[in-house]
């Protein structure tokens, strides 16, 4: 953000004009700043060759996720809606991790059908359900197991 002609602006667009057009409160994203942040983030972790997953529960803006996907990011999703949205926004299924408690059979089935990278299981019953559905579909599924030592 910077002042242009005494008006606070984002990428040469005056914030007051955004407020007039879209009302307040509003969220504004700078695609230029987003790209710069992504490039810097990836550069700083380059030696580790990580697969970076954006947490879609933190922001479900499809345009934002589509932009992030252009840089090879994956997605960490917690519902079938987020999973569908991530795929629609251009995230490759093999770069999607499905976390979250209480996944339904329908959600697990859809995740397996889409051949996502990993399903994080939150309970013994969820592990059994993933196994049951995977066997029915004759598919191998990568499963992460979350443990709480307490």
Residue ranges and their predicted role:
Residues 142-150:
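Flexible glycine-/small-residue-enriched beta->alpha junction loops
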């Amino acid at each position: 953000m910077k002042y242009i002609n005494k008006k606070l602006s984002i990428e040469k667009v005056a914030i007051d004009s955004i407020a007039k057009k879209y009302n307040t409160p509003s969220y504004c994203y700078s695609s230029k700043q987003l790209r710069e942040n992504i490039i810097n983030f990836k550069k700083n972790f380059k030696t580790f060759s990580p697969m970076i997953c954006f947490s879609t529960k933190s922001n479900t803006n499809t345009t934002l996720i589509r932009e992030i996907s252009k840089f090879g990011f994956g997605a960490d999703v917690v519902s079938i809606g987020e999973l569908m949205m991530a795929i629609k926004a251009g995230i490759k299924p093999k770069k999607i991790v499905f976390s979250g408690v209480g996944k339904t059979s329908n959600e697990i089935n859809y995740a397996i059908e889409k051949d996502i990278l990993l399903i994080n299981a939150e309970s013994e019953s969820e592990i059994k359900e993933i196994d049951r559905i995977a066997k029915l579909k004759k598919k191998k599924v990568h499963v992460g197991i979350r443990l709480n030592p307490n």
